[in-house]
């Protein structure tokens, strides 16, 4: 297809990915029970290609939330990690990024890592872990700086009062339903497991309907908490997933190729209740996608576009242009596949893959890469 119509959000592509980078380390640090809308806007006023704007935006967002009166359990720091000739580099310049075999954004607090997003050229897992630890040392310095700023100009945080389920209801529900929910969570087949979990909730609600006539929401919240605790305990303590699989086991995978005879390449991938149809199309190298934004203009020879139609989860909604989720998941697949593509001299084609979800149960982004 013509270059201009390859992707409807060409100019916003990088902004969408950067906003997702900003969001992921910030969102988990808002306290449970805080339901106010919070909007963080990062605007690039001036651009230096040697200083990644996304890192400045992530740190700036952390500073803004930290000095405000908004309840938030930051601050966080963020860095870009590269690796050149086996040596890690913090926030590499544009020229250094060209030589780096790793591009990893790490964000965290003083105590823990909050987010990692990376692309690498077949780098060993141990090296990636070393890179994360290297980044965390720099993050601690950034957090210390932000804490100094907060001490000087920060506002007192607003106090929020969260509703707490009455202790007697929680104790009764746990005593009655905890083991039942554990047994339901261990059901092997997914739909049957969900049905069993729903049955436990219905049974529990009926059991306590007379004793706690206005406690339906409280009981539902307690059961949700019990489910999370059981899943977490099974995984961390017993190394068992909710469907009785060990942590190294995967569900059966089914793949069929050549599904559409007129296309250059097609693959239908199925795992559990998730299915995806991916279609690959080849074109001249000149039909690659040009990314023209505030940073250096670049071209992509490989384009991976991810579609998540409402029907794949049994819903209806207007069919619009790709949203943040689709753009982000397409970029995730690109990051995994580009490093293993043959060089352009060996394979002089532009490649476009479109992955459509046909049926989805929980996470489906990884299916695009398969």
Give residue ranges: language-model regions:
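Alpha/propeptide regions of enzymes that mature by internal proteolysis
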Residues: 10-31, 35-41, 51-59, 64-67, ...
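Conserved phosphate/anionic-ligand binding catalytic regions in large, soluble enzymes, centered on
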Residues: 51-69, 255-280, 359-361, 368
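Extended, hydrophobic alpha-helical segments in both membrane/secreted and soluble proteins
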Residues: 61, 328-337, 349, 353-361, ...
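Mobile "lid/hinge" segments at catalytic clefts and subdomain interfaces of large enzymes
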Residues: 69-188
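Flexible, glycine/charged-enriched surface loops at secondary-structure junctions
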Residues: 32-38, 73-75, 142-160, 191-192, ...
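Glycine-rich, flexible beta-strand/loop modules in the N-terminal catalytic cores of phosphate-handling
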Residues: 8-39, 44, 51, 110, ...
């Amino acid at each position: 297809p013509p270059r201009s119509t390859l992707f409807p959000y060409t100019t916003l592509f990088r902004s969408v990915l950067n906003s997702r980078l900003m969001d992921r380390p910030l969102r988990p640090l808002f306290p449970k029970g805080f339901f106010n809308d919070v909007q963080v806007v990062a605007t690039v006023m001036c651009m230096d290609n040697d200083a990644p704007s996304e890192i400045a935006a992530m740190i700036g967002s952390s500073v803004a939330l930290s000095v405000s009166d908004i309840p938030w359990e930051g601050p966080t720091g963020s860095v870009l990690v590269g690796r050149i000739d086996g040596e890690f580099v913090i926030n590499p310049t544009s020229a250094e990024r060209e030589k780096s075999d790793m591009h990893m954004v790490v964000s965290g607090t003083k105590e823990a890592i909050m987010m990692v997003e990376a692309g690498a050229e077949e780098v060993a897992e141990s090296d990636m872990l070393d890179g994360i630890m290297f980044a965390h040392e720099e993050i601690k310095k950034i957090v210390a700086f932000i804490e100094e700023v907060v001490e000087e100009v920060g506002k007192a945080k607003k106090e929020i009062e969260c509703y707490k389920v009455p202790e007697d209801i929680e104790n009764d529900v746990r005593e009655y339903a905890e083991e039942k929910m554990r047994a339901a969570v261990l059901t092997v087949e997914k739909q049957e497991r969900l049905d069993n979990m729903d049955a436990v909730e219905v049974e529990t609600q009926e059991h306590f309907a007379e004793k706690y006539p206005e406690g339906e929401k409280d009981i539902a919240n307690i059961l949700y908490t019990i489910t999370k605790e059981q899943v977490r305990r099974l995984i961390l303590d017993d190394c068992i997933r909710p469907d009785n699989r060990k942590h190294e086991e995967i569900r059966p995978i089914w793949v069929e190729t050549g599904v559409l005879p007129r296309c250059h390449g097609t693959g239908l991938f199925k795992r559990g209740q998730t299915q995806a149809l991916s279609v690959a199309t080849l074109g001249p190298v000149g039909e690659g996608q040009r990314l023209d934004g505030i940073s250096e203009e670049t071209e992509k020879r490989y384009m991976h576009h991810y579609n998540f139609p409402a029907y794949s989860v049994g819903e209806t909604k207007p069919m619009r242009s790709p949203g943040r989720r689709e753009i982000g998941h397409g970029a995730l697949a690109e990051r995994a596949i580009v490093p293993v593509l043959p060089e352009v001299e060996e394979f002089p084609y532009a490649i476009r893959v479109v992955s459509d979800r046909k049926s989805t149960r929980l996470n489906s982004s990884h299916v695009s890469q398969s």
